[in-house]
């Protein structure tokens, strides 16, 4: 996080307006403007662990990571700067949460790329903080209003649920494949062999569907799940509980919080971070897997067929196999051998 996003560049056009403000930054925090903008005081709340890692190094305890913000997270703030995400239900969850905590009279700024649908903020907040567009640049919109009425926020009302082959999947706004199992994950699941044993790590676990489906036909596996997303971590915990499957679930930026080695690492890695295309997580996953696989252990991932992962797999493991494919997706397998680079 060094270069500013277009949304932050729009905010910087108004930097003089923020010098006396006590600001809470929230939403899709893709850079470190919250730590660098000249203000009377700054706090940040994010649901993304990797964004919190960067901000906490500069802001300390004034940067918070959690699914739901608390009164302590917004204490003494008189201004909210909210970065609109690409997912409207995610924005609604976060904004209703934050506006239920901030005092009436709080200045509300909403900024985001036009392609993210930021203009829908006006309708979403009409009953609580009527917004007006105050700037348009860098293909972004900046909206301003003042909090007139606090909404009632109930996190439980945002939970969703669907079934896959008799399994219950719990979801929240912002979780990948919130409304159903995606095609890539279906392809990966089709390759998992029944009666597998050993320690399995699910990186970027989303709602936990890969893990519970795997555990159903391989009940002796020992599961560990991780994701950068607080909604995903909570959804996976709920999915495991709903299907009576045991496993450890925690927030991690790929392997940042992962300890030990595993017999298999599975993943449907993301290639977007907010609105931006990013292959960093998947490349970190592939290169870091050798430090977390036992000898003979296996990395198995599914990815869009056009993404350039074969070269990274070969560079890291010495070889790879494509064990399933469709027109759009491929499932890759790489085995931990003496050929593999040890990181």
Swiss-Prot record:
GO MF, any single term: 16S rRNA (guanine(1207)-N(2))-methyltransferase activity
Cellular component, GO annotation: cytoplasm
Annotated localization: Cytoplasm
Family matches, as Pfam families: MTS (PF05175), MTS_N (PF08468)
Keywords from the UniProt entry: Cytoplasm, Methyltransferase, rRNA processing, S-adenosyl-L-methionine, Transferase
Highest taxon listed in the record's lineage: Bacteria
EC number: 2.1.1.172
Reactions accelerated catalytically: guanosine(1207) in 16S rRNA + S-adenosyl-L-methionine = N(2)-methylguanosine(1207) in 16S rRNA + S-adenosyl-L-homocysteine + H(+)
rRNA processing is among the record's keywords: yes
Enzyme class: transferase
Main location: cytoplasm
Family: Belongs to the methyltransferase superfamily. RsmC family.
Subunit organization: Monomer.
Primary role: Specifically methylates the guanine in position 1207 of 16S rRNA in the 30S particle.
Protein name in the entry: Ribosomal RNA small subunit methyltransferase C
Originating species: Escherichia coli O139:H28 (strain E24377A / ETEC)
